[in-house]
């Protein structure tokens, strides 16, 4: 019997892997096996969220409401993000949380669709990617979004997009640690992205959960700032 996962189930997995990544960053010693392993597992989250952002953009009834929801919860989440990361010297004080990054990724898709002039489009897209450098999931999340968006419905292009995403992240992570540790961390990061690709390209049934729709719709938006507050309090 074929294993199937709906959108919400995949998002729950992504939320859990994000939590593991945050626990590793906040509480564990950098460079240790446990820390790097949990961080690598957490690399599953960004491509999944970018994938469903692309899907959400394509099927939402109102892009304005979608963007507004992202922006509102990005603002709500900023203080919890600061308390969990910047206050603990894990990110510069001005770093914006990943919901801001997703908002920028949504803006990127709007530009990709609405701006017809290739030159202007390239400038705006590159500008949005540059702005993301002060956010969590900097640079990479906008590229993920762009690759997934441009892949459209073509299965081969979708697989290629995930392979490129895995390769780029693997190289990036490998460069952060010396020698064998860097290679191992990079390989783990690549596996996480490829696992994300497997979830959405192989096991995703294209459906969302029909039960408690409103609760599940806002679960991630509420969980994100709430878990950051809890982690920040535990770190005190």
Question: Which sequence ranges carry the predicted segments?
Answer:
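Alpha-helical transmembrane segments and their immediate juxtamembrane cytosolic regions
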Residues: 1-236
